[in-house]
Regions:
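Structured, solvent-exposed acidic/aromatic patches
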Residues: 1-279
Length: 280
């Protein structure tokens, strides 16, 4: 939190609120994943110079998310409408492209809205439609994807590659194998490597794969050495969000009657098409 707090302080001193608004986006994105995994977290008072930081309920945390995200979008929108660049030499995600940052922010708002729709449908619909009706809009194209990779002085290594190749701890699971093979999904070649194991299964495309059966746990990682693993390299980007997810979120919203600027069927099909485009 100290670096994030420092950005806020320096942004206020320099009268550049857009710098802190930009910093809010990866901050909210990371904390959203954290609260979805662990529930209540210290958020509003996190980073304060106090001995005991109070936890906020997940409902409170999401309310803070929506407030902070809305404020950030409000600050960044005029910059996006002027097609200005912001901190391009320090931006490893969008190289300073504020239009894409605002599209990401709106898409993040849609994702968060969909996460709360079973507990507060009215609020979820309000924020989802707010995101889609924004003047800059949402992610719609492959180039809109938010991804971390080398750049802006960042030494980046894909963490899945580290888990799979360096630690030997990440391999294809049987559920994923079942879906991809059962639907004869050609993206399996983009997602996973072939297996040279004598137990590998030849599938519809003539290639062989081996997956870890659900519930099987072995003490030694070497047991899984020849199983199919994620097809990533050290330089493969880590994706925060892609346009295909946004289309699927819109399809879900349309399915329950929200105004998502398209029918559920149209948006779902576009999501599938976009996923194929994203994965070659």
């Amino acid at each position: 939190f100290p670096p994030w707090k420092d950005v806020n302080i320096q942004s206020e001193k320099a009268n550049t609120p857009e710098a802190f608004a930009l910093a809010q986006l990866p901050n909210i994105s990371a904390w959203q994943k954290t609260t979805d995994m662990f529930g209540p977290i210290p958020y509003k008072k996190a980073g304060e110079p106090i001995m005991v930081v109070p936890y906020d309920s997940q409902e409170e945390v999401y309310n803070f998310f929506f407030e902070d995200l809305s404020a950030a979008i409000e600050v960044l929108t005029p910059k996006a409408e002027q097609n200005l660049k912001l901190l391009p030499n320090y931006d490893a995600v969008y190289r300073g492209d504020v239009v894409k940052w605002v599209k990401y922010a709106n898409s993040l708002m849609l994702r968060m809205a969909m996460r709360i729709r079973f507990v507060d449908s009215a609020k979820a619909q309000m924020y989802a439609e707010k995101a889609i009706n924004h003047t800059i809009g949402l992610m719609e194209n492959k180039d809109d994807e938010a991804k971390m990779e080398r750049g802006a002085g960042l030494v980046f290594v894909n963490n899945i590659e580290t888990l799979a190749n360096q630690y030997g701890e990440s391999r294809m699971g049987s559920s994923m194998f079942s879906y991809l093979v059962g639907y004869e999904d050609p993206r399996i070649e983009s997602y996973f490597t072939e297996s040279e194991s004598q137990y590998a299964v030849e599938v519809f495309n003539g290639r062989k794969y081996q997956a870890v059966p659900t519930g099987h746990v072995y003490a030694q990682n070497d047991t899984y050495k020849e199983f199919s693993m994620a097809k990533v390299e050290k330089t493969t980007p880590t994706y925060w969000m892609r346009a295909s997810e946004v289309y699927f979120l819109r399809a879900e919203g349309a399915l329950i009657g929200w105004n998502m600027k398209g029918s559920a069927e149209e948006l779902y099909k576009r999501g599938v098409e976009m996923s194929f485009e994203e994965n070659g």
